[in-house]
Amino acid sequence: MEQSHQNLQSQFFIEHILQILPHRYPMLLVDRIIELQANQKIVAYKNITFNEDVFNGHFPNKPIFPGVLIVEGMAQTGGFLAFTSLWGFDPEIAKTKIVYFMTIDKVKFRIPVTPGDRLEYHLEVLKHKGMIWQVGGTAQVDGKVVAEAELKAMIAERE
């Protein structure tokens, strides 16, 4: 049953995120949710450290966090927003659902992200109908836009 969960808490820590998102190391790219308004917007972040495995090859002696992983982090954040907007914070329902990418549009990378950065994802709902959600927004470091994208996803049953 689809319903709106307007009274959700606005902050979620890693132990909460792990109960909703199925991603795990090394692909969980959200450390904390710092603002959430159901059916509207979300702000989350990932701390970028030199210890990320990806820096072994991207690039030696010039570590830059890959743009595709920035977009994936935005998608995970949008998936958290969509799921909790529909079902609230419900780990039992989360075990039965999965969010799939459908489209990635209007992606632009503006500034490289490097170790030591706090990568913030700022997303808002552009539209949704049933299990199909479209979100758009930016990734930021120190208030500067480092990337932007529009993403469409669907929530499906896990098999």
Curated annotation (Swiss-Prot):
Q: Which GO terms describe its molecular function?
A: (3R)-hydroxyacyl-[acyl-carrier-protein] dehydratase activity
Name of the protein this chain belongs to: 3-hydroxyacyl-[acyl-carrier-protein] dehydratase FabZ
Q: Known InterPro entries for this protein?
A: FabA_FabZ (IPR013114), FabZ (IPR010084), HotDog_dom_sf (IPR029069)
Instruction: Give yes or no: UniProt keyword Ligase.
Output: no
Q: What HAMAP family does its record include?
A: FabZ
**Reaction(s) the record says it catalyses:** a (3R)-hydroxyacyl-[ACP] = a (2E)-enoyl-[ACP] + H2O
Q: Which NCBIfam families match?
A: fabZ, PRK00006.1
- Report the top EC class in one word: lyase
CDD domains found in the cross-reference section: FabZ
Q: What is its EC number?
A: 4.2.1.59
Entry function: Involved in unsaturated fatty acids biosynthesis. Catalyzes the dehydration of short chain beta-hydroxyacyl-ACPs and long chain saturated and unsaturated beta-hydroxyacyl-ACPs.
